[in-house]
């Protein structure tokens, strides 16, 4: 590897971030389980039909992606869920949005199963 600015690499980094989706584990099963858990929680919390959740979430996701374009935050479940609550006429419900986001990630992580080829450290 050719380093064009060696002066910028005079020490080891404090942390390295990398995308693990479909590298260490399959993304789709974990995402599907997490999305279903959030859907169930929202449907039960507000006594709405699943289709209402589906439509509001889809619209919220599209609006966030359109507004934030190609930024990392355009993938934020928290922003999707907060906007979904607004679309549903519930206004700014930050604590609910956080609760729903935590449900997503808790379920996602508990369903993210490593590929067989991934070695134990």
For each feature predicted by the language model, list its residue ranges:
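A metal-dependent, Asp-based hydrolase signature
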Residues: 59-102
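Short amphipathic alpha-helical interaction patches enriched in hydrophobic/aromatic residues
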Residues: 24, 42, 61-68, 108
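Active-site neighborhood of HAD-like aspartate-dependent phosphohydrolases
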Residues: 2-18, 23-56
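Catalytic-core regions built around general acid/base machinery
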Residues: 117-121
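Conserved phosphate-coordination/catalytic loops
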Residues: 75, 112-116
């Amino acid at each position: 590897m050719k380093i064009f600015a060696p002066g910028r690499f005079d020490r080891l980094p404090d942390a390295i971030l990398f995308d693990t989706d479909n590298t260490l584990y399959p993304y789709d099963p974990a995402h599907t389980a997490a999305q279903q858990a959030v859907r169930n929680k929202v449907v039960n919390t507000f006594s709405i039909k699943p289709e209402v959740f589906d439509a509001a979430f889809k619209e919220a996701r599209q609006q966030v992606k359109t507004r934030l374009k190609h930024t990392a935050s355009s993938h934020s479940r928290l922003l999707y869920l907060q906007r979904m609550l607004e679309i549903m006429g519930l206004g700014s419900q930050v604590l609910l949005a956080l609760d729903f986001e935590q449900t997503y990630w808790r379920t996602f992580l508990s369903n993210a199963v490593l590929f067989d080829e991934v070695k134990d450290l």
